[in-house]
Amino acid sequence: MTWICFLAGLALLAIALGIAQHHLGTYMARVFTSDKDTRVETWCYRVMGVNPRAGQTWKSYARAVLAFSFCGVVFLYALQRLQPWLPWSLGKGSVNPAVSFNTAISFVTNTNWQAYSPEATLGHFVQLAGLCVQNFVSAATGIAIAVALIRGFVGHGEHTIGNFWVDLTRCTLRILMPIAAVAAFLLIAGGAVQNFTGFLHVTGVAGGNQVIPGGPVASQEAIKELGTNGGGFFNGNSSHPFENPQPWTNMLEIFLILLIPFSLPRTFGKMVEDVRQGRAILAAMVVLFTVNLCAMAAAEFSGHGTAARLAGAPMEGKEQRFGLAQSVLFANSTTMTSTGAVDSMHDSFTAIGGMFTLLNMMLGEISPGGVGSGLYGMLVIAVIAVFIAGLLVGRTPEYLGKKIGPREMKLSDLYILVMPTLVLCGVALSLAVPGLRSSVNTSIANPGEHGLSELVYAFTSAANNNGSAFAGLDASTNWLCAALGAAMLLGRFVPIILILALSGALVEREPVPVTAGTLPTHNALFTTLIVFTAILVTALVFFPVLTLGPLAEGLI
């Protein structure tokens, strides 16, 4: 009966996403191509001193993104350091500099890596004015970058790729806020907490004292999932009953996680005026998502050991109210996107099951990926796939009528190399430098192969702006706070700059006519080429470290 209920829920989720992505994708395309501004948007532009009709070159667009994000880091860092003097601080003290630095970068980069216990560290004001605000604007920034890249394919001999301030404002006001508001009301109806109380001291049934935390949880939970942010109001994240009370709210959160990433391919298709192109990208995302979901489920349900046999499945670290099937679906969704929220502890998965959560991020989080980042990551894979196909037949590669020249390929290759470089260099430094290694060894709760997996997972999560963790690693040390903070910063903004530069290169190119030798990029063959290109790139880079960590652990 449990399996029947889960499969029925999975079918309903797929149907709901299929319907929603069609309408939301079309709506987002209208939002970013409209010439009209709402009154609220006009007021925002006046306050910011922005001319909404002025286009920006890719360099100007990049400067705006970096300046806005820098201000966000400074503001969020200051809020944490000044917390004792802020309202609704609940008596919490100032957050230490290393954790404040790490947290500020984490939320501005859409990572939401948490090297602290939220309910024990932060008051309501920092949660609302700091973290919740960044959940909105960091998600909007990612979507804006994806739209800027699409304009690179659409533009013909131009120099501008849109206006960052307009894209940011429209995305926040017209897309994220309305959906998040509806989702918050649904979560409240399901039992999620939404109040402004502090800690409630009560006497338990057995007569002992108990402290029950409260706060504006549902409102932050909604945008945390919708914006693929992932940072929890509580340390238990979405496994906490105040954030995610019931099985149906769990499915709702999975729906929110996947909604925008799976809708953006249609936005892409509508903006390039060929929805078949969007369908090909969407199909590649769905194939990778489904294959990894099935593989992870198979690994978890085949868990070994006496406890697993008695429970019917390896239930350590999983919530009884969700069960193994929903836990696996949530884990696959949160690591296939850049969300990082958890309703079960990934560190407690079987060795091979945990490897698939790691592998999902190593793919570059492209199926469907984070809001914005998933689409532009998949489009880079598509550009590389077109180049490989061009080499096979001896033709100059083209994609959507644009020739892919040396400049475009260099930018695409650099984009692909950023994340693996950050992950492997971060792990190597942590283990090769004696002083750092001794610090890391004290942070690893499970030495050996699993300890290596915990460290690799941390740097992979940070560099991909995911934010989930193998919780056996204590990441609050000065070295890991600084190193993971740097990985989050570089893993977010170096790819963004490369994507904007790629858009700038494409928008200047004139379209070339379609000929009999042009590679069709809207059929099943091209979708297959994209899938295998993504797998090939990941296998070449990460297979050695996977053999030393989760594969070795799983075979022992």
From Swiss-Prot:
Molecular-function annotations in GO: P-type potassium transmembrane transporter activity; potassium ion binding
Keywords: Cell membrane, Ion transport, Membrane, Potassium, Potassium transport, Transmembrane, Transmembrane helix, Transport
Cross-referenced InterPro entries: KdpA
Chief localization: membrane
Location within or outside the cell: Cell membrane
Gene Ontology cellular-component terms listed: plasma membrane
Family membership: Belongs to the KdpA family.
HAMAP family documented for this protein: KdpA
Subunit structure: The system is composed of three essential subunits: KdpA, KdpB and KdpC.
Record protein name field: Potassium-transporting ATPase potassium-binding subunit
Gene: kdpA
